[in-house]
Amino acid sequence: MRTKHILMIFIVLLSVLSCVSPEESQPAEPGNIIVLMYHRIVNGKATNLYERSSEDFENDLKFLKANSINVITFNDLERIFTSGQMPEGNSAILTFDDGDHSWYSIVKPLLLEYKMKATFFLWVYMIGHESFIDWNEVEQMSHYVADDGEKPFLFASHSYSHSYLLDSKPGFPSEEEYNSFLDYEFGVSKNLIESHTNTEVNIFALPYGDGAGDPEIIAAAKRNGYKFIRTSKWGAITDPQINLFEIPSLPILDNTTTDLIGSYLNL
């Protein structure tokens, strides 16, 4: 009788354990977050440092998918900061600088195919010039709604004139004039992008990465309504209490390998 009773308990335990999936029994560990910085995507072979071939770019997206790297946004990053907890698994934020026309012709279709979202930092003065995206294309992308009801393409500021923000300071005769220059670069670019996208612009990417962590530049960003500054400092986000005005990134260049991306995520 005792043996029969033990056998029944064993069968019940087995049935309970069989209902627990591997994911439930082994929750994912908190991972890292990497901000990937692209510029121009080209068909065929890349011919300079800041170009990436469409084939390599697509392989990057496949790498993210294959390694279950969640593509998130800067708003998600703010929620992580507020919660004080890193998300389970690794994450990536896709960003693009300047405004090359390849964003519309190459990047947009690939992101839609792989169901990924991205932030595009505009060099506002150059929009509509040769080889750059135009405002009509910016509007089309920013207003696009995916099948899940989300808008996957967000436009943000890379300044108005793409000037060095900190290194330009000695050229101004007074602090007041320098701050007026900063307000123009932050404010005018923000207002123009918002007028074409009907979306709040609160993310800024530093031209040339110049001025990362500088108090005056951060103050100018804040008074012009920004909540984030993406820098060009190489690194991954490993702590939820990140300085949102000094966000590191990883430039993706013509010869960057997916192994390098993986190394920042401990893969």
Regions found by a protein language model. Name each.
Residues 31-44, 48, 90-92, 100-102, ...:
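Metal-dependent polysaccharide deacetylase catalytic core of the NodB/CE4 family, i.e.
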